[in-house]
Each structure stands twice: as C-alpha cells, then as structure tokens.
C-alpha cells in the first residue's frame, strides 16, 4: 500500500462531528489529498469589509466536536495572508475538545487597504492535532541542559 492510501485509511477511521448552525454554511474541505489543514469558509448574510489594522469576527456557521485527546488549531491560509494581508488576529486559534459553540475566525487586516470578505470565502485552515494535558508539578529546580535559559535568538542568527 502506498503512503497516500495508508494516510487515507488512518484518516477514514477518524471522524469529527460537524453541525451546521446555518443552512448556508459550507463544511470544511481539504484542498488536496495530502493537505494537512481543512479550509474554513465564512458564512455571511452580507459582505464584511475589514479596515486596515482592524479585526472582524467572522462566523463559519458551524459547530464542531473535536475528538477527545485532540485540539483544533485555526491557522492563516497562506494565500489570504500573503496576497491580501488577512490572517487570524490571535495568530493561532485553539478549539478545545469540549467546546461546542460556533467556530468563528477573528480575522485581522495587516495591510494598508480595506479588504472585503464575502460569503463562502476560505479565510483560515483547521488542523486537528493530538493534544496532551500533562499534570503540572511544581519543583524547586529544573534539570540542566546545554542551552540553559538562552532564548530569543540564543542558538544563532540564521
């Protein structure tokens, strides 16, 4: 069996429940068979214009049930971010497995021109990834590493 067939077999075993809150809502779709993220579409009654350096909360018209042990991560779509300057305001949105409300995308306009978003536009992508929730253990000391407390470029500039 080739890699694509193996991947499809694994994916086909996992299901994520999606509920339309609006009959016009479009279910998330994968652009290709090997896409990691599913495109999220906005569900709007009328176009929304996002002014420069402003944020708009855009509904998808969907609620999802992320499987237990996983999280939904909402990322920018590269084309929308690079070509139009539109990306999630919080950089990465997190959808917890116990959240059942409408999925919304807080879209920020990083550019100098107003941008209009219309019903059915793909505005973000959803990745479903394993999520660990370890118990926090307070300690007096942490083990030493070669890196130590170096951060923010401490491992090199390139």
Model-found features: residue ranges?
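DUTPase catalytic domain/fold
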Residues: 1-158
């Amino acid at each position: 069996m080739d890699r694509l067939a193996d991947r499809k077999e694994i994916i086909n075993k996992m299901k994520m429940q999606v509920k339309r809150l609006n009959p016009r809502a479009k279910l998330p779709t994968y652009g290709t068979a090997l896409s990691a993220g599913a495109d999220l579409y906005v569900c709007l009654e009328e176009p929304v214009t996002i002014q420069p350096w402003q944020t708009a909360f855009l509904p998808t018209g969907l609620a999802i049930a992320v499987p237990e042990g996983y999280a939904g991560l909402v990322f920018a779509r590269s084309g929308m971010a690079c070509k139009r300057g539109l990306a999630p305001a919080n950089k990465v949105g997190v959808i917890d497995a116990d959240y059942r409300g409408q999925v919304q995308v807080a879209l920020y306009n990083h550019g100098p021109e107003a941008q209009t978003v219309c019903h059915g536009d793909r505005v973000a992508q959803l990745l479903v990834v394993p999520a660990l929730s370890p118990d926090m253990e307070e300690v007096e000391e942490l083990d030493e590493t070669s890196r130590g407390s170096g951060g923010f470029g401490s491992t090199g500039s390139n």
